[in-house]
Amino acid sequence: EDVVRDLLSIAGTDIVVVADDSGSMNQIADPTNTMNPKTRWEELQETLIKLAHLLLVVDHSDGFHVQFLNDPTWHEIHSKQHVETLFYGRQARGRTPLGARLRPLLSGQWHPKGHSNETELIVLVMTDGEPSDVTFDGLRQMVGSKKPSVFVTFLMCTEDDDVVEAYNRHVDRLPGVDITDDYVSEKREVEAHGKRLSYYKWMAKAVLGGKMPKYDHMDEKKGAGGGGCCVVS
């Protein structure tokens, strides 16, 4: 399948995950799910554990790296179990300092292979809200001036349409950037345009969306964003 081929084509690319551990992540992710309510923090854990296998297929040589917004420590991940241990005793609290965490990654100041390394880097940002240390205009300027070898996907961990729309409006159109909604919302949007979206393909979009425009355009009408060759089915 095309998705597998695309993932294999970026094998060896370094991947880092910036995970939101701010206090707002303690809110219920889906208020309509009264049978099995989960917080955004719990959903982030589950998503990252599921993503781990796919990320390790791509960044297989030295694992991928995870950093939390309110903890400067970088964690090197080599297995799904490593991800699980990250959350032992860890609570979501604090603010949303996206600017402070993203600036070194976007500028090349910090890279898994060393300062100012020129190899490609995929940055996955899992967050639920507005940055607390930079405005959306400031975020747009910062992301817009990133190194061309850095690709960014924002994975939205919120049901708040206003927040998702703010990210879409300010950064989604920047080159090398994608906004990926939660699976249920993204699936609904993709299917509204006559396409299908499995959970596996949604995870692939999260990894590939910033680098490969056809994944960024999955939730647009057929023919948008470059024609039929960009349609993922």
Feature map (PLM): residue ranges:
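Surface-exposed acidic, glycine-flexible loop patches that form ligand/cofactor-binding
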Residues: 5-9, 54-58, 106-118, 141-144
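Short coil/turn segments at secondary-structure boundaries
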Residues: 12-14, 28-33, 78-82, 135-139, ...
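…and closely analogous acidic/polar surface helices at protein-protein or active-site interfaces
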Residues: 12-13, 23-63
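Cysteine-dense, membrane-associated helical/juxtamembrane modules
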Residues: 13, 219-233
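Residues that scaffold, gate, or flank divalent-cation-dependent active/transport sites
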Residues: 20, 128
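Von Willebrand factor
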Residues: 74-120, 131-134, 157-165
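Von Willebrand factor A/integrin I-like adhesion domains
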Residues: 81-87, 160-210
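VWA/integrin I-like adhesion module and closely mimicked acidic/polar interface patches used
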Residues: 93, 129-180
